[in-house]
UniProtKB/Swiss-Prot annotation:
A ganglioside GM3 (d18:1(4E)) binds at residues 79, 83, 126, 165. The gene is GLTP3. Keywords: Lipid transport, Transport. The keyword DNA repair does not apply. This is Glycolipid transfer protein 3. The keyword Cell membrane does not apply. It comes from Arabidopsis thaliana. Pfam families: GLTP. InterPro entries: GLTP_sf, Glycolipid_transfer_prot_dom.
Amino acid sequence: MKRKRCEMEETTKKKKMTEIGSAIEELSVLSIAKTTIVTTEKEAINIINLPLKPLLSFCNIIVQVLDKIGPTMAVLRHDIDQNIQRLEKMWESDPLVYSNLVEILRKEAKEGSSRKPKSCSRAALWLTRAMDFTLALLQRLVKDMSQNMEQAIEECYNLTIKPWHGWISSAAFKVALKLVPNNNTFINVLAAKDETHQMVQDDITSLISLLIPLLSQLHSILELYEVSKLKSP
């Protein structure tokens, strides 16, 4: 009976889990409590462990959040999907070796393939930029839950993605920007049933605290392997 009750409680918990809650859960698995900046490959190999599967699971959650923003984020969403698939394919080729993202970046740097259009290094870079956008948007939301969503999304895009996007992608984003939902609609679809805006705000704050050190570490690794400034091919 006790086991059955525990199973029912777990099922209920899963049903109540929001995208924000799922994101917190995935980032908690990564266990990056503080920022570690590396400057040499030896440090990257010996100190940094970036488990690939939880990282990709988190990126899949970003896709779900972007879906709630609507067609405006279609270009970014498509890019994220493709980049996740590229890294998953590499992982599937040797799950033991490529369970750590650093090993993938190291392999391509050694082969001289990091800068190729379909490299896994580029995939990791663009996923990092998608996370940069997500962090910027969450920080704006937690600061002011009543702000204009269209303006917030445009400013976050201009800051994190636009400098690296080609003009076609930037133009497509600009056209779709008018389809952004208002802030109340967006917050409500992020919330669980009976969850207040304050509760959502608290969850977002928790997520931000996990995302900041992860992104600092990712940028450090990307800079080390000299792929951090690559633009769209």
